[in-house]
């Protein structure tokens, strides 16, 4: 029999934030993760709110949250005060800074815009050190996209053409630098076979790294913004980027590419290392299969694939299993379910109602806001009965569309901390109704 204070199910950003917050509070914590999370496919920036659920553009996300409880009471942000969301994000900044991964926001706490791999602009709130935070004015003489010979996951010509169409960049010269990484030929059998991890390994070698520096300095100046794919990582990406900046004296902008995203991997590795450093127990490569309940709606234990018939007990459980991509939600032809416990869902009954007629619709597809139904304490229900010691956070929640709104990171971090605080309140025998909104 295994006993913990808090058991966290899911190893994405919500799961690690919940587990870290519990560890900080002195709770004996275990995190069960199936393996690589959606962070391997993420931009590495933390979006808080780029649009309201009705589609209105947001510049100041915390101000926009104030109206959500009246207009969209089902939204996860409506169950927390804006200041709690803000404090949660700064808590994440502190955690990652301790692991050598600083994140930065604007001084006025408004959104900034990052240049995407497609040459578009996307609103976000926290970005990594080598992400150019665009507001409106462009201080660079030229923007130069770096094309790596043999690298298939970044198309600078497409990005360049799209960025030229944006009004903020129409006065800028936008060009391209073609570079070759020594050693690539030995790794590929086809003309365009290299992935970011392959190039990251090569750039650890001084010859390859110095060659890249020389090629960049040959074409770029200090007046330019050099836009390059995220090809430095594998544990020391920021160290190499800092070295690249020192040797070239250039202003660099990293863009995430097709998976694996080295920017996202940096965040996952930093959170995992911090959790283990703080004394957390990580069951990686394991899967929670089911749970046992008592008559009052308490989850008494969970079973995992690797533990077999050994139950895992906790005072409180945090479900951070993710959405469709992470299999926290599963869709069949006629229904959408939460597969571990079979929790009550918010979802339209007929498949025809799951989507809009047009794929590229101006409004959000309904299925993206489907998820587990929770009360003001982020507690789900099972067959109509409230689960007394199970709390949900992150993209398993219903009531919001993280893609349409650009709110995935903010919801994940803030609901993770809210779930843990409410779980600890339960353990400390607080009244369930004592405080519904932190």
From Swiss-Prot:
Pathway: Polyol metabolism; glycerol degradation via glycerol kinase pathway; glycerone phosphate from sn-glycerol 3-phosphate (anaerobic route): step 1/1. Its cofactor is FMN. Keywords: Flavoprotein, FMN, Oxidoreductase. It is an enzyme of class 1 (oxidoreductase). One of its GO terms (molecular function) is glycerol-3-phosphate dehydrogenase (quinone) activity. One of its GO terms (biological process) is glycerol catabolic process. InterPro entries: FAD-dep_OxRdtase_2_FAD-bd (IPR003953), FAD/NAD-bd_sf (IPR036188), G3P_DH_GlpB_su (IPR009158), Metab_Enz_Cyan_OpOx_G3PDH (IPR051691). SUPFAM superfamilies: FAD/NAD(P)-binding domain. It holds the Pfam family FAD_binding_2. It catalyses: a quinone + sn-glycerol 3-phosphate = dihydroxyacetone phosphate + a quinol. Its EC number is 1.1.5.3. GO terms for cellular component: glycerol-3-phosphate dehydrogenase (FAD) complex. Belongs to the anaerobic G-3-P dehydrogenase subunit B family. Conversion of glycerol 3-phosphate to dihydroxyacetone. Uses fumarate or nitrate as electron acceptor. HAMAP family: Glycerol3P_GlpB. Composed of a catalytic GlpA/B dimer and of membrane bound GlpC. This is Anaerobic glycerol-3-phosphate dehydrogenase subunit B. The gene is glpB.
């Amino acid at each position: 029999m295994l006993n913990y204070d808090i058991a966290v199910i899911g190893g994405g950003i919500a799961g690690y934030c919940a587990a870290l917050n519990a560890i900080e509070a002195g709770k004996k914590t275990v995190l069960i993760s199936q393996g690589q999370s959606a962070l391997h496919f993420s931009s590495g920036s933390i979006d808080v709110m780029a649009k309201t659920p009705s589609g209105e553009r947001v510049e100041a996300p915390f101000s926009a949250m104030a109206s959500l409880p009246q207009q969209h009471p089902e939204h996860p942000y409506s169950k927390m005060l804006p200041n709690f969301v803000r404090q949660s994000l700064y808590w994440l900044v502190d955690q990652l800074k301790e692991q050598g991964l600083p994140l930065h926001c604007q001084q006025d706490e408004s959104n900034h815009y990052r240049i995407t791999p497609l040459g578009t602009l996307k609103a976000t709130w926290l970005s990594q050190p080598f992400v150019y935070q665009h507001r409106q004015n462009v201080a660079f003489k030229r923007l130069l996209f770096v094309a790596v010979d043999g690298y298939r996951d970044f198309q600078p010509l497409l990005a360049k053409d799209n960025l030229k169409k944006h009004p903020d960049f129409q006065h800028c010269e936008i060009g391209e630098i073609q570079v070759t990484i020594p050693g690539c030929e030995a790794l590929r059998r086809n003309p365009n076979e290299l992935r970011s991890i392959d190039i990251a390994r090569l750039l650890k070698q001084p010859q390859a790294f110095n060659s890249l520096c020389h090629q960049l300095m040959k074409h770029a100046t200090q007046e330019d913004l050099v836009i390059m794919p995220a090809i430095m990582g594998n544990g020391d990406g920021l160290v190499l980027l800092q070295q690249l900046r020192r040797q070239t004296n250039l202003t660099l902008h990293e863009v995430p590419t097709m998976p694996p995203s080295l920017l996202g991997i940096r965040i996952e590795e930093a959170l995992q290392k911090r959790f283990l450093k703080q004394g957390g127990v990580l069951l990686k490569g394991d899967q929670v299969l089911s749970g046992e309940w008592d008559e009052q709606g308490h989850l008494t234990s969970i079973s995992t694939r690797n533990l077999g018939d050994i139950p895992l007990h906790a005072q409180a459980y945090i479900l951070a299993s993710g959405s469709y991509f992470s299999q926290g939600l599963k869709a069949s032809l006629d229904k959408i379910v939460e597969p571990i416990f079979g929790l009550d869902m918010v979802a339209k009954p007929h498949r025809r109602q799951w989507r809009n007629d047009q794929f590229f619709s101006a409004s959000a597809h309904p299925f993206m806001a489907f998820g587990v139904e929770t009360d003001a304490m982020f507690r789900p229900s099972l067959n109509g009965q409230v689960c007394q010691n199970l709390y949900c956070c992150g993209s398993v929640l219903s009531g919001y569309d993280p893609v349409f709104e650009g709110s995935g990171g903010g919801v994940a971090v803030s609901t993770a901390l809210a779930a843990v605080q409410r779980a600890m309140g339960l353990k400390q025998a607080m009244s369930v109704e004592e405080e519904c909104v932190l």
